[in-house]
């Protein structure tokens, strides 16, 4: 199957400038293509993974990827379908974030070996060497204001107000494509569907300035079956950086994907063949309660992003927490699995009576409730049920002399951190 047709089969092609011409180009030889990543945070997130993995699929098919870090455009801020203008970051912050993004991309694209090894570029390298006058003369003259205002991403901001800085963003992204086309023979740009207006500014500039032929292909912005924007957990982005979203949290995210989305996401986010995914679909529909599709998703994506060791650790944390076996996990694993639960910092020398502790830490609202919970066996310390109303937290309860884990009922966890 032609790589373009496989991408369509996987639901990864949203829009193209010329589908037949692009398919033919991908069939006839190696195509140089690029995807841009503005450093708007210190990590990429799951939303970026669609374009990243699409880029990797093309590389595996023999095409050559260019990964563009937007050191210049990141200083400006893309207005596409944003309700308000982005806060401008300092150069130092953008450089720092850009360096982190470089490291993350190297986990997915092959930068070291092969004729089609990936190339990393930064648009700050060319924008920092062009004067404002030259940019207006050599680039700005190819764009009419009517053309720029016709972009849907701009139309949505006209009534509420858009700064010239953001208005000019599409020309900057268009110039990126022109620079890569001129210097590296890059003829294809890949990006999210919200980038269509900015991306086609590049094909227009290449056509008008050098009479060249270039292509754009957008990948869809992924939503779940309810229409909710994909890639967020409890309203927060699921980051690729393990310090921002732990492998365990990412594992749980995929494990909790709805049945209606699971098989579709296998096509988008894994490198399993379409035949393998079809086999999983059949088994999944026969026994959805076994959650084969979600478990496969979690295994494939966590391993891809963080490695097999992190995946196995996430599985172990999940199993031990489900069984209530707190002592079967290291403090490092517990902190990963219990990130986000209420924490209470205490002095090491404190003698903490269980009743007072439950109230002051907010586990329960009153001493009466605390006594009831302890008497009824609803309170656990490091997995052990506590029914002694006079119980006091001791050195023996400090795991690795660092934390104590309290559980109320089956699911409500609380962590004591000792200073």
UniProtKB/Swiss-Prot annotation:
Catalyzed reactions: tRNA(Tyr) + L-tyrosine + ATP = L-tyrosyl-tRNA(Tyr) + AMP + diphosphate + H(+)
Gene Ontology CC terms: cytosol
GO biological process: tyrosyl-tRNA aminoacylation
Domain of life: Bacteria
Motif 'KMSKS' region per record, residues: 229-233
EC main group: ligase
Domain S4 RNA-binding: 352-419
Residues reported in the UniProt entry to bind L-tyrosine: 34, 169, 173
Keyword Thylakoid assigned: no
Disulfide bonds: none
Protein location: Cytoplasm
Keyword terms: Aminoacyl-tRNA synthetase, ATP-binding, Cytoplasm, Ligase, Nucleotide-binding, Protein biosynthesis, RNA-binding
Annotated positions binding ATP: 232
Record text on subunit structure and interactions: Homodimer.
Full protein name: Tyrosine--tRNA ligase
Species the sequence originates in: Streptococcus agalactiae serotype III (strain NEM316)
Gene, per the UniProt record: tyrS
């Amino acid at each position: 199957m032609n790589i373009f047709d496989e991408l369509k089969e996987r639901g990864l092609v949203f829009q193209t400038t010329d589908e037949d011409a692009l398919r033919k180009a991908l069939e006839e030889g190696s195509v140089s293509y690029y995807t841009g990543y503005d450093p708007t945070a210190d990590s990429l997130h799951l939303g970026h993974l669609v374009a990243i993995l699409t880029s990797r699929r093309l590389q595996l098919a023999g095409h050559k990827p260019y990964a563009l870090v937007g050191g210049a455009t990141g200083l400006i801020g893309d207005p596409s379908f944003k309700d308000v203008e982005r806060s401008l970051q300092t150069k130092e912050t953008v450089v720092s974030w850009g360096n982190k993004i470089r490291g993350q991309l190297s986990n997915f694209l092959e930068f070291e070996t092969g004729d089609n090894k990936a190339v990393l570029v930064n648009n700050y390298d060319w924008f920092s060497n062009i004067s404002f006058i030259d940019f207006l003369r050599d680039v700005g003259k190819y764009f009419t204001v009517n053309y720029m205002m016709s972009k849907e991403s701009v139309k949505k901001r006209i009534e509420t107000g858009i700064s010239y800085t953001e208005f000019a963003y599409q020309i900057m992204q268009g110039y990126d494509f022109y620079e890569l086309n001129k210097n590296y023979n890059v003829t294809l740009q890949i990006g999210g569907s919200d980038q269509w207006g900015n991306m086609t500014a590049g094909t227009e500039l290449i056509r008008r300035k050098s009479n060249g032929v270039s292509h754009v292909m957008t990948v869809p912005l992924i939503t779940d079956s309810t229409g909710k924007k994909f890639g967020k957990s409890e309203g927060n982005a699921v980051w690729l950086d393990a310090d921002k979203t732990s492998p365990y949290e990412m594992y749980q995210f995929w494990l909790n994907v709805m049945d209606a989305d699971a098989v579709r996401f296998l096509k988008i986010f894994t490198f399993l063949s379409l035949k393998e995914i079809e086999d999983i679909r059949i088994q999944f529909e026969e026994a959805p309660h076994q959650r084969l599709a979600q478990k496969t998703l979690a295994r494939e994506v966590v391993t891809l992003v963080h490695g097999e060791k992190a995946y196995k650790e996430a599985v172990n944390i999940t199993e031990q927490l489900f069984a209530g076996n707190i002592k079967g996990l290291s403090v490092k694993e517990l902190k990963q699995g219990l990130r986000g639960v209420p924490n209470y910092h205490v002095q090491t020398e404190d003698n903490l009576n269980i009743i007072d502790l439950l109230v002051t830490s907010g586990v329960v609202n009153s001493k009466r409730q605390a006594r009831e919970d302890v008497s009824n066996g609803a309170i656990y310390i490091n997995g052990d049920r506590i029914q002694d109303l006079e119980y006091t937290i001791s050195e023996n309860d400090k795991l690795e002399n660092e934390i104590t884990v309290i559980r109320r009922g089956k699911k409500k966890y609380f962590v004591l951190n000792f200073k």
